[in-house]
């Protein structure tokens, strides 16, 4: 990979915390992270490296920060106090501020099914353990419609309603 044109100070624009430089890519932050099992997986350590290396274009195209479910488990797990959840929020803010037309795929997923992550693998695991199926708003058409109507009143969805039409 050629880093000659990367912005070595990009980290200051996105997440101006010296703690970011302490990340040694151990992966402990994804321990217990529900989004780390998503498709694609949210791997905070990869995002931290991309920020440090100044990979601006790659970060613009990255949708995984939007799959974070805000559980903050990464904050508890990080041995270097990098504050991965704050990094995720800062990256989302930077992406939105630099591209007002950006509609993360997670928003489309939230509209269609009420949550950002597919739970297929979790459901298979639950079945293998003899646990009941989790309730899902997608199986409650009236509630899903109410939820979608509510979301349609938000600017990001109402101004881009073509993305949320029924297929």
Question: Predicted segments — roles?
Answer:
Residues 1-22, 28-32, 40-49, 53-56, ...:
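Non-ligating segments of multi-cofactor redox enzymes
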